[in-house]
C-alpha cells in the first residue's frame, strides 16, 4: 500500500512536471509553470509524503504496524523494523532537501518552513501515541511495534532540525538509525530464540528468564535499555544527538517533549526488565538452550550496542557528518 502511494505520487509528479530528477522538480516548483498547475502537483507531493509516512511508521500512518509486527514471522518483523525504516528515512531526507531546498520560495513563502513544522507535529504525535499505547501491551512484538512508532517520532525531530544545521542533523539521523538497527536486531534475536523454545510471545511469559537463560535476559536488557536511552548503551547517545540538533534549531519545545516521552518509554522497557529478573515463573526449572553460534551472535551484538554508545561514538558520528557533507556537495 505504501509503495503504491509512493509510485502513484511519483508517476503523477512526472506527468505534471515532466521531470524525473529531484533538482529538476525543485526548479519546476519555483517556476511560473507551477502556478498554472499547482493543485495536481501538490496532490502528487502529498501522496509521496504520505507514502513515506507509512514506510517509516509515523503516526497517523502507523495503523498497519502493530498487527504486522505481531502477526508476521519474527525474522520478517525484524527486517521490517530496521531495514525498511532506515532506508525510508534516508530517502525521505534526500527527497525533502532536494525538492524543497531552503532557497525555494512559493508565493512569497519559504516552503522549507512548512515541512519543518509538519515534521515537528508528526514527531510529537508519533512519540506520544507510540509510547502511551505501548504502556498497555501484553505481547512483546506488539510492544516493540509501538516502540518503533515512537522511535520514528524521535527521528523526525532530526528531520525537523534539518533547516538549521543540515550536516549535523543528517548525521544525528544516520547515527540513530545505525544504533536502532543493531538494537532492534538484538531484541528480535532474543524474541526468536525465546518464542522457538516456549511457543510464546507474551511479556508475562518472560518471567524468570534471567534464571532460565541469563544470556537471553542480558541481551534483551541491553536492547531495551538502549531503546530507552540509558547509558552506556548506544540509544543514549543517539537520542542526545537528536535532542541536541533540535535545540540548535531553536526547537526547544520539541526537544523537551522528546525528553518527556523518553521517560515514559523507559518505564515500559524497565517493566519488561523487571519481569525477566524479579518475577517468578513455574517454568524456572526449565532452562532455555541456545546453541553456540547464537550465543556468539548475541554476544557480538551486545558488544556492538555498548561500543556504539562509548568508544565508537566519535568515529561513527564523524563518518556520518562527512557522508552528509558529501551528499549535497
List where the protein language model places each region.
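Alpha-helical transmembrane segments of multi-pass membrane proteins predominantly involved
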Residues: 1-329
Amino acid at each position: 500500500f505504501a509503495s503504491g502511494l509512493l509510485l502513484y505520487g511519483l508517476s503523477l509528479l512526472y506527468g505534471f512536471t515532466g521531470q524525473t530528477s529531484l533538482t529538476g522538480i525543485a526548479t519546476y516548483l519555483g517556476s511560473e509553470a507551477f502556478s498554472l498547475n499547482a493543485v495536481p502537483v501538490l496532490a502528487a507531493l502529498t501522496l509521496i509524503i504520505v507514502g513515506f509516512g507509512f514506510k517509516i511508521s509515523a503516526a497517523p500512518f502507523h495503523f498497519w504496524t502493530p498487527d504486522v509486527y505481531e502477526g508476521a514471522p519474527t525474522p520478517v518483523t525484524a527486517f521490517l523494523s530496521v531495514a525498511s525504516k532506515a532506508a525510508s528515512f534516508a530517502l525521505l531526507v534526500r527527497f525533502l532537501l532536494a525538492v524543497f531546498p531552503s532557497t525555494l520560495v512559493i508565493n512569497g513563502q519559504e516552503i522549507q518552513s512548512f515541512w519543518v513544522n509538519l515534521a515537528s507535529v508528526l514527531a510529537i504525535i508519533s512519540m506520544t501515541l507510540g509510547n502511551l499505547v505501548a504502556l498497555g501491551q501484553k505481547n512483546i512484538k506488539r510492544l516493540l511495534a509501538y516502540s518503533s512508532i515512537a522511535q520514528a517520532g524521535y527521528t523526525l525531530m532530526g528531520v525537523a532540525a534539518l533547516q538549521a544545521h543540515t550536516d549535523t542533523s543528517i548525521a544525528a539521523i544516520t547515527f540513530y538509525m545505525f544504533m536502532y538497527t543493531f538494537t532492534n536486531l538484538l531484541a528480535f534475536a532474543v524474541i526468536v530464540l525465546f518464542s522457538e523454545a516456549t511457543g510464546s510471545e507474551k511479556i508475562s511469559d518472560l518471567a524468570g528468564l534471567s534464571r532460565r537463560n541469563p544470556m537471553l535476559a542480558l541481551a534483551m536488557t541491553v536492547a531495551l535499555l538502549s531503546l530507552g536511552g540509558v547509558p552506556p548503551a548506544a540509544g543514549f547517545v543517539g537520542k542526545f544527538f537528536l535532542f541536541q540538533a533540535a535545540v540548535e534549531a531553536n526547537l526547544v519545545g520539541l526537544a523537551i517533549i522528546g525528553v518527556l516521552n523518553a521517560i515514559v518509554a523507559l518505564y515500559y522497557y524497565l517493566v519488561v526488565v523487571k519481569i525477566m529478573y524479579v518475577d517468578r515463573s513455574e517454568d524456572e526449572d526449565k532452562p532455555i538452550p541456545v546453541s553456540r553460534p547464537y550465543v556468539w551472535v548475541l554476544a557480538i551484538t551486545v558488544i556492538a550496542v555498548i561500543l556504539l554508545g562509548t568508544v565508537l561514538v566519535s568515529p561513527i558520528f564523524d563518518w556520518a557528518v562527512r557522508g552528509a557533507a558529501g551528499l549535497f556537495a
